[in-house]
């Protein structure tokens, strides 16, 4: 009960790779101990299999705070590797429980393609992917740029972005765990320059802005 703070299982989060079909189950609990975890996992895998669903990984996420935020900071892998893979714009991405990933796969591919085309990249540009998450926009642009720099405050997402670049053989991308606004200011003061900046979500202060949003207003 979220209002009273009682009970064990707060949420059950499902993620599925659109192109790979891989399935992740995230059990969000109010405490670290999940009684009968091994038997529960075994039963879940069995029942899912009967329905023709092959679960790739099961993760326990612990959120002991009194909040409406779904996921907490502590995680424990109960089955599999703790992540699933999916393909987007010709590249493969590892998705962990807290990774941000666009829900509408088809439209995301169209959107990213349009964004890269609108940037008129020639292969000579330094591209900054601000608020980069797991690196999907930056790595999509990497094939058309001299260098890509991604900045993201979520350290887990940056870890995924670095792994995604390595997995896809992208050698012209670097990722930093930092507040993007602050990092940009410090980089500019140090004399670093970017030819193109992708900002998702967009920010004020740009002289030329290609605005993309799931609900543009």
Regions picked out by a protein language model, each given a short descriptive name:
Residues 1-5, 14, 19, 34:
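Extended interfacial segments that mediate partner engagement and assembly in macromolecular machines
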Residues 1-11, 74-80:
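Conserved alpha/beta core surface patches that mediate binding of polyanionic ligands
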Residues 12-14, 86:
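A structural signal for short hydrophobic beta-strand segments in well-ordered beta-sheet cores
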Residues 13, 24-26, 100:
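Short aromatic/hydrophobic contact patches that present stacked aromatics
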Residues 15-17, 28-30, 61-65:
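Short loop/turn motifs enriched for small/polar and acidic residues
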Residues 19-21, 54:
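Short loop/turn segments at connectors of secondary-structure elements within structured domains
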Residues 21-29, 94-96:
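Short, aliphatic-rich beta-strand segments
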Residues 35-213, 217:
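Rossmann-like S-adenosyl-L-methionine
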């Amino acid at each position: 009960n979220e209002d009273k703070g009682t009970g064990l299982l707060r949420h059950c989060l499902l993620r599925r790779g659109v192109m790979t079909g891989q399935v992740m189950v995230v059990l969000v609990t109010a405490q670290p101990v999940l009684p009968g975890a091994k038997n529960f996992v075994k039963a879940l895998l069995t029942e899912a299999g009967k329905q023709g669903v092959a679960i790739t990984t099961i993760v326990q996420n612990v959120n002991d705070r009194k909040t409406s935020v779904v996921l907490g900071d502590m995680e424990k892998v109960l089955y599999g590797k703790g992540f699933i893979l999916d393909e987007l714009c010709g590249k493969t991405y590892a998705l962990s429980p807290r990774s941000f990933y666009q829900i509408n796969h088809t439209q995301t591919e169209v959107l990213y393609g349009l964004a890269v085309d609108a940037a008129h990249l020639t292969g000579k540009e330094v591209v900054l992917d601000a608020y980069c998450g797991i690196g999907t926009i930056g790595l999509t642009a990497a094939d058309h740029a001299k260098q890509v720099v991604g900045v993201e405050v979520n350290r887990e997402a940056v870890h995924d972005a670095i792994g995604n670049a390595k997995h896809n053989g992208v050698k012209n991308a670097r990722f930093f765990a930092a507040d993007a606004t602050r990092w940009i200011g410090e980089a500019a003061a140090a004399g670093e320059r970017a030819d193109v900046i992708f900002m998702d979500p967009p920010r004020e202060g740009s002289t030329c802005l290609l605005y993309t949003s799931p609900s543009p207003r």
